[in-house]
Amino acid sequence: MSALVLGADQINSWIAQGLWPMFRIAGLFSVMPVLGGGEVPVRARVGLAALVTLILLPTIGDVPAVDPLSATSLLITAQQVLIGVAMGFVVLMVFNAVTLAGESIAITMGLGFALMTDPQNGVQVPTVSQFYMIMATLLFLALNGHHALLLLLSESFRVLPIGEPLGADAVWTLLKWAGIVFSGAIAIALPALVAMLSVNIVTVSYTHLTLPTIYSV
């Protein structure tokens, strides 16, 4: 019976096969809503990243055969973290569009002074904005947004393979999301803004008509 002999290259390949995808997934979880806030412990995020890595491992494909302690390995690690953080910011910007819409509605309604602490970012936000954020989070989970996120992660390893340089198209796509965020916020807030503006116009018009009568009495 022959003994099992493992070479250094094979061990390094096994380590890289799971470690580099985990860095990308952990970068995503550190920024995205729900998981990226301070209320979720770091150990929980790392454990969840390890679990998701095991689930997606069959779909990741081959990774470069690089020594984990080399400079090339450090560059690949930094690249994976950067990709994960960028993906997390894309998801975060979608939720920020909802927050921005809530702030616009609160200011229009005159409720901008009613503030509460946002546990996600640790800042004071209008209550209406926080309500919108909670509803967006519940809709995200109810509509299986977390399933779509797993599909996005799996697809990212095909579009942006581990170890390959980032193309200009991928970076430009992420940058274009800034404009999409503001347009999305306007689309979400527009019905409430139009309603409040109509109420304000009617109120001002009614006050303008009744004030002369009051002063003449």
Q: Which residues make up each language-model segment?
A:
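Hydrophobic alpha-helical segments and their helix-loop boundaries in membrane
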Residues: 1-209, 213-216
